[in-house]
Amino acid sequence: MDCNSVPIDTSHLPYCFTRFPVRIHKDKEEIQRFTLELIHATKKEDSKAHKHSLYKYAFGPDMNIYSLSWCEADLDKMKLLIDFIELTWAHDDVAEEEPLENAVAESERLCRAMYEEYDSEPVADNGFGMRIKRFRDIRDRMKAIDAVGWVEVRDATEEWLHIDAKLKNFESLEEYLNIRKVHVGNKITTSFIRWTMGIRLSKAELSFIEPYTDCIGVWLGLMNDYMSWKRERTQPTDRVVNSVHLVMNKYNLPEEAAIDMIRGVLVRQEGKVLEMSEDLLGRTELSTNMRMYIQNLEYYAGGLFYWHFLAPRYTKPQSFDPERAD
């Protein structure tokens, strides 16, 4: 039952080609207010990071990524989710522009912040040190609310923080997508669906549903690559993690042909997800929690597509020039 969200009509957007349902949290104004308040409180005013963060939310409450992606979340838990995701996004944005060796080392240190036994480790008096302190604080607050659910979030985050070490020159799109489904953060974001809604699944249920969530992870990686290529193609980095770039090099394709190819793969992957959804929901033995989870995975996918499709972060990407933010 959908208690916290309302549907969004996308029929007036002819190029919005997803078939996933799109919904938005009924408390979208409060979620937007909290998001902006957090950005102002944690980032230096007029800094590059501050401007880039604000740009993500420039279209107001109707385009808040949290309201769209976790549309059925408990509001109090949603605020902790926002704190957690904004911090991991900040780390990811910085790590993308760091040499790979540095990024892997910083990810390892951030990972240790999820475990109390490392709290005695000193932290530097800089931006990274502040992220470590914030991560420890968020960890404690999440555990206080739901310690069991926190373990699932922690384990998914740990896998994601270590994924950069597996990046390489991939031999095939299939090999790339097997890593990309983790690299894109799908396991973290889907664990947050369960955590924010109090959905408890057994280990057997999580194992049973994993092929479906992996299928969504592949779709999410392709969708993010397709939507973000315009932004990422000029990003200063020693590694480009994007399937458009991969097929351009693998098949010696011009850029537009590579973009069209990835769009085709994306559409076919969405079809696979929807077929699996229909098959799973047709099974009479599924628990109520499992049905709720599958339905909200579709909402999550639809909300993320809608946000990527319209967000200024991707439709009008900002400059990566350190002296500019537009």
Predicted regions and their residues:
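Alpha-helical, largely C-terminal catalytic domains
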Residues: M1-D326
